[in-house]
Amino acid sequence: MQCPSCQHTDSRVLESRAADSGKSVRRRRECLNCEFRFTTYERVETMTITVVKRSGTRETFSRSKLLTGLVRACEKTGLETNRLELLVEEIELQLQQRNQKEITSQQLGDLVLEELGDLSEVAYVRFASVYGKFSGISDFITTLDALRQRNQVKRQLAKIS
């Protein structure tokens, strides 16, 4: 592992422990050249998922890009970044379990909205407005009506169970 301070390639592991609920390993290292200490994370390499955009272009699924979009949508909603990171992990896990190499941006957005609807109605509408490219107030009204109906159905199902 290359030292971020001096770029020397030899380091020793001082400590290792499980991270991300056992999905990765956190290692504390020390450079053998300059004694700089740094942390690395190892995680299982999963199947690469390609997102097919509306324009037809393809790009590799990016956890950080999704998290950035969620953080922006959830500003001032009280949702903590830790919860959003878990949400991104849940979504990525769902994508991996589908065992499909491609997903459309529409399908990905719908998956995100399904999860966001349970966390924050405000974040749901904010995310939907960007992902759905709202063009006017009627788009907001349609989304709010759909969200209201979705939540009513969920409440009714919860009463039945």
Swiss-Prot record:
One MF term in the entry's GO annotations: ATP binding
Whether DNA-binding counts among this entry's keywords is yes
Summarizing the function annotation, the protein's role is:
Negatively regulates transcription of bacterial ribonucleotide reductase nrd genes and operons by binding to NrdR-boxes.
Q: Which cofactor does it need?
A: Zn(2+)
Q: What is this protein called?
A: Transcriptional repressor NrdR
Cysteine pairs bridged by disulfides in the record: none
Originating organism? Synechococcus sp. (strain RCC307)
What gene codes for this chain?
A: nrdR
Per UniProt, the keywords (alphabetical) are:
ATP-binding, DNA-binding, Metal-binding, Nucleotide-binding, Repressor, Transcription, Transcription regulation, Zinc, Zinc-finger
Q: Which InterPro entries match?
A: ATP-cone_dom, NrdR-like_N, RNR_NrdR-like
Q: One biological process GO term for this chain?
A: negative regulation of DNA-templated transcription
Domain ATP-cone residue range list: 49-139
Q: Where are the zinc fingers (unnamed)?
A: 3-34
